[in-house]
Amino acid sequence: MFMVQHTLLSDDIAHARFACDISRCKGACCVVGDAGAPVSRSEVAVLKKAYSQLKDRLSAESRDKVIVNGLIQESTDKKLELSCVRSGECVFVQYTDTGVATCAIQDAFYKGEFDWEKPISCHLYPLRIKKLSGLEWINYEYIPSLCSAACDRAEKEGIYLADFLKKPLIRRYGESWYTEFVAACEHIRTMKKEYSNEARNELSSGELTNNKSRVEAEKGVNNTRPST
């Protein structure tokens, strides 16, 4: 675990490679899960505005869900989350002609039709934020069925999670925080690399010592054999 200003972060965030590959995952993070995306109370008004403006683009099932249960629900631990239809997809999901699930809010944002991109919890995924003793604790939520395509792409292209999520992290915490965060990640990676090299050298040195001892022992045995 490491700390950047007022946030705690799990070490795997520094090492993880991640870059969405929506052509493969088909927007799975928008349609799979036991609950809807977490939202803050400060986001409620803009989400209601988005729904009012975009509801005609959404499925009939999504609109029915909102009529019956509301756009935003409260979980058992009193946290707010977006409503989902029975199949698990967010009520704001819409599909492309190729079957990719996309966010209606984000789509409208990119087209210049809405002035807000999407909930910060969606923007930051696969990072999840929890409150811990007055601090924010950020974890990397790796779910193979959702994240494997993104991890495969990132490994091939050499993209770190910390770099891929630059925009939402700055949106959440600001430029100065992000600069410190990147520096901390680079330091952690360097330390791990140096430790790995040291461990490898020690292992090689140990193997050489063992081999030398074994050779000397064999010589000793040969020298003490009785002549015939």
What does each model-identified segment do?
Residues 1-228:
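Short loop/turn segments that flank or connect secondary-structure elements
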